[in-house]
């Protein structure tokens, strides 16, 4: 089956929905959203807790409520979508191959594509935990789906490895469902989640958080019977004699998220090794002109509100590209200096910036009373004071056209600088 669409969006989660709605509002009528699940909304459908929408809608919503707001806009604008449909591949000249049980094999010619595939969880195999291989070991997201959508309880006595936001939220969810969460162990000396989740999900329920600890052994024949954690040194190696044993039946893993970029790599899109997502410019455009990306497929976000904001930019940019309104120009590279893990975008052209450029980034460690500084040729063109920064919380800085006008090189450097005493 051969089809033609102006814009194809791969992924019908919060990023794909926001991008589709924005593209339609910017004059693109022929849009197709492709989603491999049986419903739109992506991961939000299993996030039944509240805390979503504070930035986007100025009110607190649950995940399904937030998704429904965007789905309603999609339906209202009559944007076409296909569910239960798998994208098999994308070519550089923007031909999408997809398959489902109704239409069969489809070849879709597009003028532009937006990648919004989200991310997946890192598994036990990826982090090589030693020990037996019994039942009762789940990723936090899988446990979340079992409990919130399928109605199955995953265990009664639980240990959680990793303090990412999903792990913290599942510590609370399991407690509310009647399980006993014995401990949360985190390999790093700081939590990987938002401070508000540590307070609301662990502190409020007296669940201990062990920083600089990891699982060193899993014991169990058919089902998990015991999990042993131990303190680690600065090289992340377990310190003998610091072991703590927990008799439990379940181990949850919240050990990081990986942007879902198998299709991106196969298409030949350049990937940033720091984010594991596509390298993008000021328009959220990848290294292949006309193919854009946004949301967790580019870099992992803390808040879905920020995913929506970023995806609207991608939707608007794709509309501009289709209408031939994108201006080419010299790229200015954004380099990371002291303390900065990555930035998005990684490069930009002055010609396409209307009012300002927003840079998203994460720091490498916890900082207090510092400045984020932007330099051009070792000259500070912008600085922002920060009382507290942590790797678990994404930072954003906005560079105005006036600031950008001070750049006199083909690169800028973003770094953390200690406050002058």
Predicted regions and their residues:
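Mid-to-C-terminal Rossmann-like scaffold of FAD/NAD(P)H-dependent oxidoreductases
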Residues: 305-306, 313, 317-384
């Amino acid at each position: 089956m051969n089809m033609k669409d102006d814009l194809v969006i791969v992924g019908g989660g919060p990023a794909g929905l926001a991008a589709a709605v924005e593209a339609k509002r910017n004059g693109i009528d022929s849009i197709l959203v492709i989603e491999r699940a049986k419903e739109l909304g992506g991961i939000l459908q299993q996030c039944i807790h509240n805390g979503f929408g504070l930035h986007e809608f100025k009110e607190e919503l649950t995940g399904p409520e937030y998704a429904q707001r965007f789905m309603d806009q999609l339906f209202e604008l009559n944007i076409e979508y296909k569910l239960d449909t798998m994208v098999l591949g994308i070519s550089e000249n923007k031909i999408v191959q997809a398959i489902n049980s109704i239409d069969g094999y489809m070849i879709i010619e597009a003028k532009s594509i937006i990648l919004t595939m989200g991310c997946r969880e890192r598994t036990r195999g990826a982090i090589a935990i030693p020990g037996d291989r019994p039942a009762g070991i789940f990723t936090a997201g899988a446990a979340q789906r079992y409990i919130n959508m399928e109605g199955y309880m995953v265990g009664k006595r639980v240990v959680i490895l990793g303090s990412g936001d999903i792990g913290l939220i599942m510590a609370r969810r399991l407690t509310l469902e009647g399980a006993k969460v014995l401990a949360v162990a985190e390999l790093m000396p700081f939590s990987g989640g938002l401070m508000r989740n540590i307070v609301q999900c662990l502190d409020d329920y007296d669940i201990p958080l062990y920083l600089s600890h990891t699982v060193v052994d899993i014991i169990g024949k058919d089902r998990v019977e015991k999990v042993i954690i131990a303190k680690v040194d600065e090289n992340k190696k377990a310190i003998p004699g610091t072991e703590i044993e927990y008799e439990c039946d379940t181990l949850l893993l919240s050990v990081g998220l990986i942007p879902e970029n198998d299709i991106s790599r196969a298409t030949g899109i350049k990937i940033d090794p720091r984010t594991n997502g596509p390298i993008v410019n000021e328009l959220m455009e990848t290294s292949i002109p006309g193919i854009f990306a946004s949301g967790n497929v580019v870099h992992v976000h803390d808040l879905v509100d920020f995913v929506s904001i970023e995806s609207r930019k991608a939707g608007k940019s794709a509309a501009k590209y289709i209408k031939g309104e994108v201006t080419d120009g010299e790229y200015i590279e954004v380099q990371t200096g002291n303390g900065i893990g990555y930035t998005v975008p990684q490069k930009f052209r002055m010609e396409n910036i209307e009012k300002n450029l927003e840079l998203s980034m994460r720091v490498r460690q916890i900082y207090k009373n510092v400045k984020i500084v932007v330099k051009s040729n070792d000259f500070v063109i912008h600085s922002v004071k920060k009382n507290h920064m942590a790797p678990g919380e994404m930072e954003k800085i906005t560079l105005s056209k006036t600031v950008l006008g001070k750049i006199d090189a083909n690169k800028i450097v973003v770094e953390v600088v200690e406050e002058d005493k």
